[in-house]
């Protein structure tokens, strides 16, 4: 068991601008890291993987698509949690990342802020679907990082 809790940020990339690929990932990463530091920096370390930091369509650092695919799928298989943005529900790569996580019993949380129609398999392979970034990040901090489920219970009661 690792001393680092690793979160992979999946979501559409191919037909999106660099900003559309990256901005939500940066916000979620900042929010999770900030919550981790505020809650208790002595608990398990958190590493948030933003694949745009490694490969994107703006800076062609790769030679082949296979290189990108293997790099990303390796991160998925070695993560403790996969967060998926439903910004492009028809993305083949995102669908593959969800399936790989599911097959490896890695929890999948979906962020669907625009209430896009999702394939039934996305829904079935996810552990929870959120329509709000802040609720998602609070849930991750409480449920996965600190294992303090009291704020999750109070959030559910408010619904």
What is each of the regions a protein language model found here?
Residues 1-159:
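Conserved catalytic or regulatory cores that recognize and/or transform ribose-phosphate-containing ligands
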């Amino acid at each position: 068991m690792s001393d680092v809790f690793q979160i992979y940020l999946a979501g559409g990339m191919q037909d999106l601008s660099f900003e559309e690929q990256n901005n939500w990932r940066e916000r979620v990463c900042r929010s999770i890291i900030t919550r981790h530091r505020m809650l208790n920096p002595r608990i398990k370390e958190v590493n948030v993987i933003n694949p745009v930091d490694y490969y994107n369509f703006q800076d062609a650092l790769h030679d082949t698509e296979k290189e990108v695919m293997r790099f990303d799928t390796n991160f998925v298989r070695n993560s403790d949690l996969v967060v998926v943005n439903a910004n492009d529900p028809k993305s083949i790569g995102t669908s593959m990342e969800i399936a790989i996580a599911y097959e490896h019993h890695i929890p999948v949380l979906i962020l669907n802020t625009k209430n896009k129609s999702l394939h039934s398999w996305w829904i079935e392979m996810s552990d929870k679907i959120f329509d709000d970034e802040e609720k998602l990040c609070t849930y991750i901090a409480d449920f996965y990082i600190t294992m303090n489920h009291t704020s999750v219970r109070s959030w559910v009661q408010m619904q």
